[in-house]
Amino acid sequence: MHWTKYIASCALSLSIGAIALAAAGQSTSPPLESKPAANTPISTASQPAAEEWWKHAVLYEIYPRSFQDSDGDGIGDIKGITSRLDYLEELGIDAIWITPMYPSPGIDYGYDISDYTAIDPVYGTMADFDNLVAEAKKHNIRVIMDYVINHTSDQHAWFKESASSRTNPKRDWYIWRDGKAPGQPPNNWQSWFGHSAWTLDPGTNQYYYHYFYTQQPDLNWRNPEVHAAMDGVLDFWMQHGAAGFRIDAVSRLFEDPGLHDDPYLPGFNAYGDRNIEHKYTDNFPEVHDVLKEVRRVVDRYPGNPVLVTEADEPSVEELTKMYGNGDEVQLPMDFQIADVNELSAPRFRGLFNQIENNSAHGQPEYFFSNHDQPRQRDRYGDGEHDDQIAKLMAVLLLATRGTPQMYYGEELGMRTTDPTRIEDVHDPIGKLGWPKEKGRDGERTPMQWNAGAMAGFTTAAKPWLPVPPSAAQYNVETERKDPDSIFNTYKRLLALRKSNAALRDGSYQAVNESDPNVFAFLRRSGDKTVLVALNMSSKSRKVSFKLAAKGVKGTGLTVLYCSPAGAAVSRVKQVELAPFAALIAEVN
């Protein structure tokens, strides 16, 4: 097919997308069900099964400090999120996962919780949260809470009681041990953030264990009272309208009761410690008992609540265990995919194939950016084709089978903007590991709403983190006006995903599996077959797709989405893809 004919096809695809969006109208997710009133007894019997809405949903992670400030203090808040629900609905989002908004000293910016059943005043009030849930429901958007299950803050009332004496009733709610000798911790276990995982409490002359910061003591999940208390946390937020939970650091819940030393590995970490294998503090089988328990609690509520886990497992086999027998979590986050830091067709193909063939036949959950890792634009961009690569990654995220999870600003092409001086660092990781480790501030900068000095995020003279210079070009207001922007690419793809049955819930099948440059696959539902082709190289590629071997009889292609213009597309044996091109086409 020649250039002019391709442009006509591409233009047609945009029209088809617009028609599909209009026809789709509202989100295809089922209407949200009413929550039980607070303090209403909930039957322990399972509720009637609701549609598995999370299989067709697109999740969107919000870091609340950075999304929208409503009161001019330079920090994002709940009212700010509520004010942007129209935007999220316009984009096509079905559910928002909000990172912790609970009261916290802020050592780890919310992941050190001092009260599980309240809202931190910096973000607002419980009334603000209830209003957010109610308004989100009007936009057919669900709200998923962050369930920080492994540890509390050392300022939590539970820990203060536990630390008050060796005989306190809550002493065993945390993990206390004697040192192996005066001035020496019980063993060599290391904190994820460097140095010993044990801190001496001088008042009781025992050490407490913390997988993360000193100020984040681990709960003792071998204590039934801890189970009961944390189940109460789930009940509280379910009764306030939560649609489910993202469970934090789930693989760290249990440790070796025998306190065996972890094996040392070669080299040193960013904090100067000898590297170790976390053999005795990770992935104990009892984790699955806790996940089953959490599932039983949330399943008492209507609306088919969803559980998402931060499960940075070392293999797809370990990740698969998080599904259980359909009685644990529905969506274990796939860090295998997210940790790929290069555009590699063979590597992505291999990982997608593995998770597709998981023995539990569970629903995949994919993401490429979050609040703990550099943004995808910086990890995959080559400095020359960054915008086009961002569009390719949008297709990879939204056209595969599974539940995609976006990170705020990803739809704009936001960059990671690391601090350049230690004096400007907020994240403790950066403070401890500078300059080798810059911390996570760079991926948590304010959402870029417009090209103004504060990017529309705040009216304050100084936001909590600086607005990146890239906000002048990459922002909602500017990109809305450009039909070929990254924002409009996401919007178009989200509409196509909702309107096309094959993309929404069709099967996945890789094709041309020996191609080192083009990652291609089929999505099939009934008599509909869609081909997705992604050129992950900086050179044009001519590709012939041999689909007959996959049971596909059609040889013609109708373009549904293509970027950039310049490919030659008419039949499966005559496809030319420009550098970093992304193509979605129906086979006929």
Residue ranges: model-predicted function:
Residues 54, 258, 262-280, 289-304, ...:
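Loop/helix patches that line or flank the sugar-binding groove of alpha-linked glycan CAZymes
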Residues 569-588:
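C-terminal beta-strand-rich structural cap/linker in extracellular carbohydrate-active enzymes
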Residues 1-11:
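Bacterial N-terminal signal peptides that target proteins for export
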Residues 547-564:
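Solvent-exposed beta-hairpin/edge-strand motifs
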